[in-house]
Amino acid sequence: MARKKILVIGANGFTGRRILDDLSRNLSYQTTGCSLHDDICPHSGNYRFIRTDICNRQAMEKLFQEVQPDVVINTSALSVPDYCETHHAEADAVNITAVEHLAECCEAGGSRFIHLSTDFVFGGDTDRPY
């Protein structure tokens, strides 16, 4: 039986790193992690790591073609509320537009998509959707 291919996006973050480490210990999975920056723990597990910008549509499409994941776990985000409040365009690009594109890539490739988010609701005092 072929090993399930799992792609963990945001693998350098707190949650993503723990998920990547746990999944990479299970040899029935072929685990790949990706993040904007180089792997912070390059010798910590049995996984492949690819540096990728989730806001770059072409790079994400190439990643999906290369990995052909069965399951995608997205833990990436701009998650500091004060920063997001003052950097709307960047927050929207990472937390909305990139996630929409991830969902499209998953749909096109037949991958299951698990998206982890936050319980924070931003704003409420502006006319912008939240």
List PLM regions with ranges.
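NAD(P)H-binding glycine-rich loop region in Rossmannoid oxidoreductase-like domains
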Residues: 51-94
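N-terminal Rossmann NAD(P)H-binding glycine-rich loop of SDR-like oxidoreductase domains
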Residues: 3-26
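SDR active-site strand-loop-helix element
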Residues: 9, 34, 75-76, 113-118, ...
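N-terminal Rossmann-fold cofactor-binding loop
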Residues: 32-42, 53-54, 76-77
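Helix C-cap/helix->beta junction micro-motif
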Residues: 27, 67, 105-109
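NAD(P)-cofactor binding segment of oxidoreductase domains
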Residues: 72, 86-114
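Active-site "gating" loop of Rossmann-like NAD(P)-dependent oxidoreductase/epimerase domains
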Residues: 78-81, 86, 119-130
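A generic structural motif
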Residues: 26-32
